[in-house]
């Protein structure tokens, strides 16, 4: 604002881009094909995928495009990027206003795999912190003895991080000297052993009180928010909440924040909250508040698990895509559904961008049939989770009070953590989706990375009760290999293959009942 009076910015359109229409139709249709353009923004929330979290990119008609085929001139061929509400920001004389950022990717294909790879590559470039992929335990207690044992077990098996989970008793909002001292002592112990430690804080989906909750513009009262009730981040409580979390992290040295709910985009009609004037600026100011906090965390290398699409604002990881109630099903169903989640959740997310779940103890229900404890009695199921999660390169919330209970369990976990770490670079690389898990036949994925010695890593699962032997076609185009490939099963000797005209090979595989096989491609 170069003037002498304050300016009020009611709304803005940050991007206007006219493109060639994706669909030509004389008649108007209910769902038009959209142009093949990927639009990302840091103003994204209430979603665990780019599509569901999009709040700014809108395709609109272009009435000046009078030569289009559609009789009503309704072809959506102009991209506009704008906030859904506001910002209704006041710009003081000499001041400035920064909009959200929009990033556009023009894919060279509509092929789902190739386009997905381009999206993953874009996020690796724009949010490199999303490539961090530590192995962590979701610890269910803050009892000092339990925490110290968990630290020691992490060291013993190769885990790298502990998150004091929901239900553990952790309260980051308590900045009393006693609470700070107790948790700093635990953090110091973890750090002395080379283990990072942090914890869980609930933000959305809770009610504080009528003065601090978001106010429904239709009723003038709390309630009716996206998750029922939520505090307004511009309320006195909301402002104090972030101040308390900052003090907590600075005083304890905690390394991780698992921020449940985050800010999902709730609007607030209150005119009494100090952080916003009214409804029109409530969404913008709340988003700015949480984005500023995440950037503060990012600057201090605080790892952020956020079940929302806040990557471009600083978060490291979101959910891979699952329904929590499914972790209360019997163990065998969890394994199959978990692998489907992994397969489906890695089209637009790199393996490091999503977390999955393993209920070592009961989560929401299901009793003994749904849990792995006692661990020593369910080694097959424990191994299945470890292999498929590490094999996909996706970390899980291993939720419980411990990682092992016997030497045999310890050996199992140590073996598969070591396997993952040996092949970590290729297992964290892009996934080519070979066959989706369906419980009826082999399912498989292929990690690819032309820049590594291991150009590919093929992981095959057999969910049936009988051994399966067959020729599996393996697409190797994205490995960067053009003529020949050396393939070895496990740590066995390599075999030479000549690639066909489609850059693939036919691999004879034999996978045991309810088992798996893996191959390294060089």
Task: Describe the predicted segments one by one.
Residues 1-213, 396-440, 450-456, 463-470, ...:
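Conserved structural scaffold segments of CAZyme catalytic domains across common CAZy folds
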Residues 69-80, 484-506:
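Solvent-exposed beta-strand/loop surfaces of large extracellular or lumenal domains
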Residues 133-144, 165-180, 223-242, 274-286, ...:
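The substrate-binding groove and active-site-proximal loops of carbohydrate-active enzymes
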Residues 143, 183-188, 192, 196-254, ...:
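Active-site-adjacent "subsite" loops/lids of carbohydrate-active enzymes
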Residues 160-167, 242-275:
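Active-site groove signature of glycoside hydrolases
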Residues 183-195, 282-302:
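Alpha-helix-loop-beta-strand connector modules within alpha/beta enzyme cores
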Residues 290-493, 508-510:
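Active-site-proximal substrate-binding groove within the catalytic cores of carbohydrate-active enzymes
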Residues 498-522:
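C-terminal beta-strand-rich structural cap/linker in extracellular carbohydrate-active enzymes
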């Amino acid at each position: 604002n170069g003037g002498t009076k304050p300016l009020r910015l009611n709304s803005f359109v940050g991007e206007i881009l006219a493109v060639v229409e994706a669909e030509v139709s004389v008649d108007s249709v209910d769902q038009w094909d959209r142009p093949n353009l990927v639009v990302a923004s840091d103003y994204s929330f209430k979603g665990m995928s780019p599509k569901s979290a999009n709040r700014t990119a809108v395709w609109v008609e272009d009435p000046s495009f009078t030569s289009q085929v559609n009789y009503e001139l309704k072809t959506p061929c102009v991209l506009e990027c704008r906030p859904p509400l506001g910002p209704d920001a006041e710009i003081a004389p000499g001041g400035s206003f920064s909009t959200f950022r929009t990033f556009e990717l023009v894919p060279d294909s509509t092929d789902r795999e190739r386009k997905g790879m381009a999206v993953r590559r874009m996020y690796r470039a724009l949010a490199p912190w999303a490539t961090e992929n530590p192995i962590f335990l979701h610890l269910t207690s803050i009892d000092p003895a339990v925490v110290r044992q968990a630290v020691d077990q992490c060291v013993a098996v190769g885990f790298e991080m502990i998150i004091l989970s929901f239900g553990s008793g952790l309260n980051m909002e308590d900045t009393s000297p006693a609470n700070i001292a107790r948790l700093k002592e635990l953090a110091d112990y973890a750090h002395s052993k080379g283990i990072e430690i942090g914890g869980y804080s609930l933000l959305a989906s809770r009610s504080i009180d009528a003065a601090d909750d978001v106010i429904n513009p239709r009723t003038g009262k709390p309630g009716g928010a996206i998750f029922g009730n939520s505090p307004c981040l511009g309320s006195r409580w909301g402002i104090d909440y972030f101040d308390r979390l900052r003090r907590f992290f600075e005083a304890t040295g905690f390394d991780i924040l698992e921020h449940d709910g985050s800010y999902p985009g709730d609007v607030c009609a209150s005119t009494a909250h100090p952080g916003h004037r009214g409804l029109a600026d409530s969404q913008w100011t709340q988003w700015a508040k949480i984005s500023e906090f995440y950037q503060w965390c990012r600057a201090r290398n605080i790892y952020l698990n956020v079940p929302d699409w806040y990557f471009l604002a600083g978060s490291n990881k979101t959910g891979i895509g699952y329904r929590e109630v499914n972790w209360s099903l019997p163990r065998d169903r969890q394994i199959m559904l978990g692998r489907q989640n992994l397969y489906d959740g890695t089209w637009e997310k790199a393996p490091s961008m999503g977390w999955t779940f393993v209920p070592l103890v009961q989560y929401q229900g299901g009793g003994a049939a749904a849990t792995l404890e006692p661990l020593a009695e369910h080694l097959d199921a424990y191994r299945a989770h470890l292999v498929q999660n590490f094999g996909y390169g996706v970390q899980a919330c291993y939720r419980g009070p411990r990682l092992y209970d016997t030497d045999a369990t310890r050996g199992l976990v140590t073996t598969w953590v070591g396997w993952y770490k040996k092949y970590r670079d290729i297992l964290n690389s892009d996934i080519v989706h070979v066959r989706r898990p369906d419980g009826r036949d082999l399912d498989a994925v292929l990690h690819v990375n032309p820049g590594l010695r291991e150009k590919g890593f093929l992981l095959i699962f057999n969910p049936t009760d009988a051994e399966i032997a067959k020729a599996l076609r393996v697409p190797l185009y994205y490995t960067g290999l053009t003529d020949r490939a050396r393939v070895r099963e496990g740590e066995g000797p390599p075999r030479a293959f000549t690639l066909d005209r489609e850059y693939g090979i036919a691999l004879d595989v034999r996978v045991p009942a309810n088992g798996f096989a893996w191959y390294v491609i060089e």
